[in-house]
A protein has these predicted regions:
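An alpha-helical support segment within catalytic cores of ATP-dependent transferases
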Residues: 2-18, 113, 125-196, 206-208, ...
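Acidic-and-aromatic substrate-binding clefts and catalytic sites of carbohydrate-active enzymes
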Residues: 53-56, 236-239, 277
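Conserved catalytic motifs of the protein kinase core domain
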Residues: 42, 86, 190-191, 211
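ATP/Mg2+ or Mg2+-diphosphate-binding catalytic cores
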Residues: 248, 270-297
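Hydrophobic alpha-helical segments that form the core
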Residues: 260-270
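Active-site Asp-x-Gly
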Residues: 191-193, 199-258
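ATP-binding pocket architecture of kinase catalytic cores
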Residues: 24-138
Length: 297
C-alpha cells in the first residue's frame, strides 16, 4: 500500500521543519490524493499529496490568491517538496471543524449560513476588468469563448475512444456543448474570483460561534463567473440552503437552475479527465435533471 510510504515522507518533512518527529501522524485519503496530519508539542502541520501531476502547484497559487481576497484564514504553505517520486506541500494546520459536521441546531445553521454567504459575496466582489481568466495574465471578455477554452479539452476527452463515458453520455455532452451559447448568454457579464470547489467540506467553522473559520482546498481558482462556485454549494449539506440565502443578497440571472446542472456536469467531466473518476449512474441522473429543466425552460 502507498499510505505507509506517504506517512514516512510526511514524518521526514515534519522532522526537517520542526527538528523532531511527530507524535501524531494520521493519514486520510481524499478525492485528489492524501492528507497527513502531523503534530508534536513543537507544532502541527498538514502534509498533502496529490494523484494529479501539477495539482499541488495550482493549489499553492490558489491559496495565495484566496488569502489576498478573504479576511478569514486560508492555510499558509510552509514549503513544497518532492521525495521518492512524490510531490507534496506542507501547510498550516488551521483550527476549526469541518462544516460537513455542523450540528442540526437552528442557531448554528443560521450563523454559518449568514457567515459563509457573506464571505462568498466578498470573494465574488473581486472582479477582473479584462474579463474571464484563461491562463496567467491572459483573459477573454466573452464567457462563451472562455468556456470554450476551458472545456474544449474536456469535451475531447469525453468523446475520445479511451474515455469511460458511455455512448449515451457522450451524446448528452455533445448536445450540451452545442447549446452552451444559449445556456451561458444570460451570465456573459462581469467575472468574479472563484474558489472553484467551495462546497462546505472545504470549509472549517468555529465551534463556539459557528461562523466560518477557514477556507481550504481551492481547485482551479481564478476569474470565472460567480455561478462557477454556486453549484458546488449543493454538493455537501444541501440542507444548509446556502444558494437560497446567497440569492436573497444578490439575485441571480434567469435560468440559474439550468446552468447549475450544466456547470456541474462539465465540472464532473473535468474531474474525470483529471483523475479517471467515473460514475455513470451519478452522471446520468444529472443529465436527466438538466434535460427535464431544459425541456420546460
Amino acid at each position: 500500500m502507498i499510505q505507509p510510504q506517504l506517512k514516512q515522507i510526511a514524518e521526514t518533512a515534519y522532522l526537517t521543519m520542526y527538528s523532531q518527529r511527530p507524535e501524531l501522524c494520521n493519514i486520510q485519503e481524499t478525492f485528489y490524493g492524501w492528507v497527513v496530519f502531523v503534530a508534536s508539542p513543537r507544532g502541527k502541520a498538514v502534509v498533502k499529496f496529490s494523484r494529479e501531476i501539477g495539482r499541488l502547484a495550482k493549489e499553492i497559487t490558489g491559496l495565495k490568491r484566496l488569502s489576498d481576497c478573504l479576511d478569514c484564514s486560508v492555510p499558509e504553505v510552509l514549503f513544497f517538496g518532492r521525495e521518492e517520486g512524490y510531490d507534496y506541500i506542507m501547510m498550516e494546520w488551521l483550527d476549526g471543524m469541518s462544516a460537513h459536521d455542523l450540528p442540526n441546531d437552528p442557531v448554528a445553521l443560521e450563523s454559518f449560513r449568514e457567515s459563509y454567504t457573506d464571505l462568498l459575496l466578498a470573494l465574488h466582489d473581486n472582479q477582473a476588468q479584462q474579463g474571464f481568466e484563461l491562463t496567467e495574465d491572459q483573459y477573454e471578455p466573452c464567457l462563451i469563448k472562455a468556456f470554450d477554452s476551458w472545456m474544449a479539452p474536456v469535451l475531447r476527452y469525453v468523446q475520445s475512444g479511451c474515455s469511460p463515458f458511455s455512448p449515451k453520455l457522450k451524446e448528452a455532452y455533445g448536445s450540451m456543448w452545442e447549446r452552451k451559447e444559449e445556456i451561458l448568454s444570460p451570465i456573459n457579464n462581469n467575472s468574479s474570483f472563484v474558489h472553484d470547489d467551495c462546497h462546505v467540506g472545504n470549509v472549517l467553522f468555529d465551534p463556539r460561534t459557528f461562523k466560518v473559520a477557514a477556507i481550504l482546498d481551492p481547485c482551479d481558482a481564478g476569474y470565472k463567473h460567480r455561478e462557477f462556485d454556486l453549484f458546488h454549494l449543493y454538493d455537501v449539506r444541501p440542507d444548509l440552503k446556502l444558494v437560497e440565502r446567497y440569492q436573497e443578497k444578490v439575485p441571480l440571472a434567469e435560468g440559474f437552475e439550468l446552468r447549475r446542472w450544466f456547470l456541474s456536469l462539465w465540472d464532473d467531466a473535468k474531474h474525470s479527465r483529471n483523475m479517471g473518476w467515473y460514475d455513470e449512474a451519478w452522471l446520468t441522473s444529472k443529465v436527466n435533471q438538466f434535460n427535464e429543466i431544459y425541456a420546460h425552460r
